[in-house]
Amino acid sequence: MLPFDLKAILGEKYDDEFFSYGNKYSEILESEGILIFNSFISNNGLAILQKEANDLKDLSYKSSSEYNVYVSEHDSSFSSDSPRNRIMSTSKKCIPNDLIPENSILQKIYYSKIIRSFFKALLNKNELYPYSDPLSSININYYDKGDALGWHFDNSDFTITLLVKNCKKGGVYEFFNDMRYKDGKEDY
């Protein structure tokens, strides 16, 4: 059963019944490669999350990096302009998990047993464990003018992204299913 504090921040349709049917979404994830849960957070919850993020922003650190879309080492067997070696850039500000208060909505969602059970069923996993890295399990990322998250393939089995504030312009989120591999091999 959803705790009261989560009921107050989740969107209207995300109730106990919704979270009891994680396996219902497995087929959609398998065929589409992505699931989008619109209005997952209520307007009230979103306002609280935005305030939490704004209150922490002064503690954020600036991070910039360059990488190829595979987030792997340069491969000299391919040309520099090959998709395998094309360089992307990311710049952002970040708050690591150790600076996010224990009573934060993000912490409550992350450690919620009912939400974890939902994703276990959805992903057909016997167990999901919280990420033990004290910095990386939950992050708040800020993208100010000129910042960007460069295109890349995720290296994890799955990623959960919670968009707390839309950008004023730009910010196109792109997702392509079944693009990385061809005949069981990475397709450059």
Task: List the predicted regions and their residue ranges.
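Fe(II)/2-oxoglutarate
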Residues: M1-S31
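A structural signal for short hydrophobic/aromatic patches embedded in well-ordered alpha helices
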Residues: Y25, G33, I48-Q50
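Short glycine-enriched loop/turn motifs at secondary-structure junctions
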Residues: L29-G33, P101-E102
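Short amphipathic
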Residues: L35-I41
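Signature of the catalytic double-stranded beta-helix
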Residues: I41-N43, I48, E52-D55, S60, ...
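Short, solvent-exposed beta-strand-terminating loops
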Residues: Q50-K51, D55-S77, F176
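Long, compositionally biased
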Residues: F78-D81, F158
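Catalytic core of non-heme Fe(II) oxygenases with the double-stranded beta-helix
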Residues: D98-Q107, R116-Y188
